[in-house]
UniProtKB/Swiss-Prot annotation:
SUPFAM superfamilies: FKBP-like, Triger factor/SurA peptide-binding domain-like
EC code: 5.2.1.8
Pfam families: Rotamase, Rotamase_3, SurA_N
Signal peptide coordinates: 1-27
Primary gene name: surA
A GO biological-process term: protein stabilization
Location(s), subcellular: Periplasm
GO CC terms in record: outer membrane-bounded periplasmic space
GO molecular function, one term: peptide binding
Name of the protein in question: Chaperone SurA
PpiC domain ranges (all copies): 180-281, 293-391
Task of the protein: Chaperone involved in the correct folding and assembly of outer membrane proteins. Recognizes specific patterns of aromatic residues and the orientation of their side chains, which are found more frequently in integral outer membrane proteins. May act in both early periplasmic and late outer membrane-associated steps of protein maturation.
Catalysis: reaction(s): [protein]-peptidylproline (omega=180) = [protein]-peptidylproline (omega=0)
Residue pairs linked by disulfide bridges in the UniProt entry: none
Amino acid sequence: MRRISSRLSLVLFAALSCATALFPAHAANPRSVEVDHIAAVVNNEVITARELRERVEQAIHQLNRQGTPQPPADVLERQLLERLVLERAQLQLARETSLQVDEATLERAIARIAESNRLTIAQLQAALEKDGVSWSRFRDNIRTEILLTRLREREVDNRIVVTDAEVDNFLANNADALSGEEFELAHILIRVPEAATQQQMAGLVARAETAKQRLNSGDDFARVAASYSDAPDAMNGGALGWRSRDRLPPLFAEAVRELSPGSVSPVLRSSAGLHIVKLLDRRGGAAAGPQQLEQTRARHILIRTSEILNDSEAESRLLGLRERVVNGASFAELAKAHSADLSSAKGGDLGWLSPGDTVPEFERTMNALKPGEVSAPVRSPFGWHLIQVEARRLQDVSDERKRNAARNALRERKADEAFEDWLRQLRDRTYVEYRTGKE
């Protein structure tokens, strides 16, 4: 059970600004369709004009807060409608495959959001309502984000495999990738359908070149991103934040070599589509020397949730196993009998773990334990865990850290690329009909 980065962001700022929280996708009921226009049909569901108006108002609120110039109204509406279509297609797939978010999981996520912002639940609710976001809407938004996160984990992240040969090749051919240098980037993505015709491709290339020409003439990057980009971060100016070189797709890593802060790349082509990258800033770059890190020897029992085993039942099952360990049962033997992880054959033994080797939820819980202690059940993107810490040590892990960093970088690269491909394939097989008149 090694690290695949968790995709669930803590979205308090987004919710407070009515910015990026996701609206719940419900099948439209007949009465609402009768009194509202239909903006689009997605498979067997509709997106109403009211939903689209809400999303437009939300985006305008966000752009104003960020001080980002607004794109033309028709462009903004078209961009947001396409995002609603893609979001609805994902949520339909989640429902069809019985993915759910139970109340206990939702309450824990909201508690973490409040805690990370040093608020009580009551203070969080008051802050949201002061800014015009109802508590029920906020809860629905968080539930939707968790659901989309779990869908990505199941369909993409959990299927990513990085081999030792790939790690060796990465280290041999990317000598400067682990130097510690970081880049602050923004980007524009124009998705290209998998089976795009020559005419479609020409139109998309023309769209990318138009965006580039606007940038060359001095137009604001955030405004152009909001007008042209198909990426989820388009309404945030296309901001990717700070990324180390090893976390960048090879296409971006090569492009930033030629850029100085403030400059913009030419139009780039990848399997996901067409890209324009802006280098906002760069920092760091000193190579890391020998590292002594505290490592933890741990075991765990993993219970995965499924259509027939929900979160509450998985947690309850682990509580029962924990009680047996406290009463003298062998953790290793229980792991062999009950754990769904590959480590079960070794009694749940994960070996010596360095910081960053496991997902944050697991690591935080493990770090709070003393040798010999057993945790309460904890949830991660992989399922529910019971963790036992056996020992700790200081270890020179310079070479091991390089390999782990390379493996994590490759995993994130492959996951991001696979997710973009998966989204494109999902969109291509989704029936979509756009409506412009009243229905």
